[in-house]
């Protein structure tokens, strides 16, 4: 891994430093209580923190992922070093409050770092609740999320019209670049942090480059693997705060984390990456 600390970006609403590579838990943390299933997840969490990463993003919609995240973070004594993000996905004020209270219990964290409104579900109701929770100190940051490109204009409209949103989470990758024009400029203008999900498009991008060598010129920005290239492309976008690849594989986590170190591609190199991808 390159010398020096992981690259960080400031959360615009506070200035708090956020390392650019985090961890998603969708599917991969939905496991049982047996040690065999949890051991690699423990290793992944250790690697994240030892490399300087902080963000762990989960959700009530990810099956047992919230509970597993809470268990493992507690067992490893990592709570002071991780930034726990979860979501609310329900309609109605009382159901929203109950779901968020349950998330705090499962995550073993009376104060959650970030709660996001998942897929904009009943977002006006949940946003009002989240604002109250933030005022009471039950959550440090609040946000909105979606995973489809079709939702980007609505995410942008909400950022433009609703004050006090700290984070927006969206799908963005070298293969799906709509956010570059539809959302990221608005997020930057409104000073909203951006979390990127699905940076590898659920693994589809690796199938496209299977058997193909990483270009030699990728060494110009300290990149040796396709995973690093995909992630460095994303985090080189100034509006992006953090990317959250999901993995239960310690080797993959180690590779992903390396993207957060060393040089990042400049605008000309990013254009070259786009041209390469579009030619495949």
What are the residue ranges of the model-derived segments?
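N-terminal binding-site loop/beta-alpha segment at the start of enzyme catalytic domains
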Residues: 1-82
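Acidic (Asp/Glu)-rich catalytic clusters
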Residues: 12-18, 69-81, 100-110, 130-135, ...
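Short, well-ordered coil/turn segments that N-cap beta-strands
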Residues: 16-21, 52-55, 78-82, 109-113, ...
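Active-site mouth loops of central-metabolism enzymes
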Residues: 26-39, 85-94, 119, 145, ...
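Acidic-and-aromatic substrate-binding clefts and catalytic sites of carbohydrate-active enzymes
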Residues: 31-33, 59-67, 89-96, 118-125, ...
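Short, acidic/polar
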Residues: 33-48, 92-108, 149-159, 226-231
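Active-site groove signature of glycoside hydrolases
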Residues: 104-125
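Beta/alpha (TIM)-barrel catalytic core signal, keyed to glycine-rich beta->alpha loops juxtaposed to Asp/Glu
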Residues: 119-280
């Amino acid at each position: 891994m390159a010398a020096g600390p992981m690259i960080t970006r400031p959360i615009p609403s506070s200035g708090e430093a956020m390392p650019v590579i985090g961890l998603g838990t969708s599917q991969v943390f939905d496991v049982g209580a047996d040690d065999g299933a949890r051991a690699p997840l423990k290793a992944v969490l250790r690697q994240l923190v030892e490399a300087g990463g902080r963000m762990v993003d989960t959700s009530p919609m990810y099956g047992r992922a919230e509970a597993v995240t809470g268990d493992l973070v507690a067992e490893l004594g990592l709570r002071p070093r991780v930034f726990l993000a979860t979501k609310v996905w329900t309609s109605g004020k009382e159901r929203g409050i109950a779901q968020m209270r349950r998330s705090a219990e499962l995550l073993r964290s009376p104060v959650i770092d970030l709660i996001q409104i998942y897929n904009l579900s009943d977002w006006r109701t949940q946003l009002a609740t989240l604002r109250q929770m933030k005022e009471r100190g039950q959550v440090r940051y609040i946000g909105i999320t979606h995973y489809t490109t079709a939702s980007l204009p609505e995410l942008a409209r909400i950022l433009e019209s609703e004050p006090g949103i700290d984070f927006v989470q969206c799908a963005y990758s070298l293969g799906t670049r709509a956010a570059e024009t539809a959302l990221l400029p608005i997020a930057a203008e409104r000073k909203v942090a951006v979390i990127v999900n699905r940076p590898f498009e659920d693994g589809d991008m690796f199938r496209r480059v299977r058997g193909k060598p990483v270009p030699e010129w990728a060494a110009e920005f300290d990149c040796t693997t396709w995973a690093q290239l995909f992630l460095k492309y994303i985090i080189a976008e100034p509006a992006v705060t953090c990317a959250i690849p999901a993995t239960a594989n310690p080797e993959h986590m180690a590779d992903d984390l390396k993207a957060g170190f060393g040089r990042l591609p400049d605008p000309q190199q990013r254009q070259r990456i786009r041209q390469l991808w579009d030619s495949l």
